[in-house]
Each structure stands twice: as C-alpha cells, then as structure tokens.
C-alpha cells in the first residue's frame, strides 16, 4: 500500500493524520495542503465506514484512531451535554451517509499559500 511521507517520521505523520481527521469530523471542513487532504481523505472515509457499521468492534477501532476531543457542548433542560468527536461520528455523521457507498469527502482547490506557494485546498464532508 502506498502513502505520502509528507516530510515527517512515521510517528509524526500518524499523529498529524489523526489530528486532521479528528478536526475534519468535528468541524466538517478544514483548509490544508493538497497532499495532506488526499491522505486524510483515506482515513476519514474509513472512519465514516466504521461509523456506518455501528457495532462495538467498529466503535473501538474508531476510538483507537480518533482523538478524544470535545465536538459540541449544549444545554438541554439545565443539563450540560458534552459530545465527543467519536460520538459525533457515530450519532450525527454516519447516519447522514447511510445510503451512500463511499465518496464522503470533497476537495476544493483554492489559491496557493502566500509564503511558499503550496497548493491549498478545502476538504469537507459532502
């Protein structure tokens, strides 16, 4: 299986992909370089597919990859409800794509980055 090294060691690369995938799940749209976006597209699609499966094993596999970050805080009936990125993946995002077989993300090209001319894109959930 081929992958992009992204100029980092394997542990740094894996940590960056976990962070970007978690950010994409939480925000549903992020701005990054084209190479990074093409890599996190793979991991995000796998996480959404696990979310669609919805069983305990899929939840544990996703929990091993997705960072434990707060996705949403809201109040209902004087109780504060905190939703993690994993809960958002399984309760909000996965049901949205129940009828869709793959292709959960979209990459839109934007202007190059001013400092070094890197190709910048917006990656978002469809």
From Swiss-Prot:
GO terms for biological process: translation. The keyword Ribonucleoprotein applies. Gene3D superfamilies: Ribosomal protein L17. Coiled coil: none annotated. Keywords: Ribonucleoprotein, Ribosomal protein. One of its GO terms (cellular component) is cytosolic large ribosomal subunit. GO terms for molecular function: structural constituent of ribosome. Part of the 50S ribosomal subunit. Contacts protein L32. Belongs to the bacterial ribosomal protein bL17 family. HAMAP family: Ribosomal_bL17. PANTHER family: LARGE RIBOSOMAL SUBUNIT PROTEIN BL17M (PTHR14413:SF16), RIBOSOMAL PROTEIN L17 (PTHR14413). This is Large ribosomal subunit protein bL17. It comes from Latilactobacillus sakei subsp. sakei (strain 23K) (Lactobacillus sakei subsp. sakei). The gene is rplQ.
């Amino acid at each position: 299986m081929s992958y992009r090294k992204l100029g980092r060691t394997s542990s740094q690369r894996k940590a960056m992909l976990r962070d970007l995938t978690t950010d994409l799940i939480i925000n549903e749209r992020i701005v990054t370089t084209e190479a990074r976006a093409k890599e996190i597209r793979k991991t995000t699609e796998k996480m959404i597919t696990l979310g669609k499966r919805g069983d305990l094993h899929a939840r544990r596999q996703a929990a091993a990859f997705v960072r434990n970050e707060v996705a949403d805080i809201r109040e209902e009936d004087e109780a504060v409800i905190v939703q993690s990125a994993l809960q958002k993946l399984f309760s909000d995002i996965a049901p949205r794509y129940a009828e869709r077989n793959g292709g959960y993300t979209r990459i839109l090209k934007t202007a190059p980055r001013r400092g070094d001319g890197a190709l910048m894109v917006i990656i978002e959930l469809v």
